[in-house]
UniProtKB/Swiss-Prot annotation:
Homodimer. Pfam families: HGTP_anticodon, tRNA-synt_His. One of its GO terms (biological process) is histidyl-tRNA aminoacylation. It comes from Rickettsia conorii (strain ATCC VR-613 / Malish 7). The keyword Lipid biosynthesis does not apply. It is found in: Cytoplasm. CDD domains: HisRS-like_core (cd00773), HisRS_anticodon (cd00859). The gene is hisS. It catalyses: tRNA(His) + L-histidine + ATP = L-histidyl-tRNA(His) + AMP + diphosphate + H(+). This is Histidine--tRNA ligase. InterPro entries: aa-tRNA-synth_II, aa-tRNA-synth_II/BPL/LPL, Anticodon-bd, Anticodon-bd_dom_sf, His-tRNA-ligase, HisRS-like_core, HisRS/HisZ, HisRS_anticodon. Keywords: Aminoacyl-tRNA synthetase, ATP-binding, Cytoplasm, Ligase, Nucleotide-binding, Protein biosynthesis. Its EC number is 6.1.1.21.
Amino acid sequence: MTEKLQPLRGMKDLLPDDYKVHDYIINKARDVGVLYGYKQMSTPIVEYTKVFNRSMGESSDVISKEIYSFLDKSNDFVALRPEFTACIIRSLISNRLQHKLPLKFFSTGPVFRYDRPQAGRQRQFHQLNYEYIGAKGAITDADTLKLAVDILKALEIEQDTTLELNSLGCNESRSVYQQKLVEYLNDFKDQLSEESKIRLSKNPMRILDSKSETDQKIIANAPVLSEYYTDESKEYFEELIQYLDILGVKYSINPRLVRGLDYYCHTAFEFTTKKLGSQSTILAGGRYDGLAKIMGNNDDVPAIGFAAGIERIALMREYNISEVKPVFVLPIGKNNICYALEIVDKLRTENIAIIIESLGKIAKRMQRIFNENAQFIIFIGDEEQANNNLKIKDLKKAEEYIVDFAKALELLKK
């Protein structure tokens, strides 16, 4: 017996009904981005693995556990992209776009992470991604956060989310804080989870993200980053808060919200929800002024961005999306097909969606049409062909018309 082929675990087909929702989400988000000056771009799904090794760090969960990386036929290590930001910055550098800064980019498409599949978390999933590159300052961060809010509003889910906000401060603030955090955690080293013990020496701030209950109890009394802000860091965060208040953006300051990579600074944020269980983050981002230099640029490039998971957005609510119902053309006999094709072609040039139903018995063809919940059927038989007419049945009104092409066009475009 032939093996029944299935998609890989954690990877799903997007069938038409799924794709309709995805397309709706993408179009809504794109339209909001246009109002903020964002332009769409695309990068390859496959990149050299070193692009992500540099951007995420080899000790990160994504690189050490989740990345799809393999040796290609040229003996190069390549990877399916696990996120967009590194790809966008790589593109900025390789296309020498630095002299055109500032730039605002919108991207969308699949990303890949080898994770345990569950509701709202797949191994292939799709993201909306926004990057504002070459602009610094709290005003830029406020504008980016307002963009995120407006996207969630356009998708009718903003009311079910909470903006969690924090400042990572400047390099000096984080350096002092990291030292104090390590001193505190060293006293509990034997009680930490195995994963956090590894992070303690490589990336201690990532311990604050730990899901371990034991770790969380220890972290509850750990020093807080805001206690070590420089004056510059305090002023930056206070300015951001002022702008958000002016814009009417609601937020909750979460002092434990961090990013564990050195190139992140100042603003970090997540939009979370209680509607999706453990997969509570809908949209997340932050400022990453140090990434471009890590990836080979001569200088640091200020930047801020965020990504949102399309599948998670789709789980937040049901979208009633109207779609164009095609008109069905049904030639009665084989000798009516040529005339039917002429009619179909003429109607399509008038931007009317048409499906020709010519296969099988009339009863089966009619059943397929009923299953599509169509409104109009055009019957073409010998009489219609001889008189150069069309018989149109309106299934919703239960009415029938025999008209010429011009009248048919008028009727179908109402």
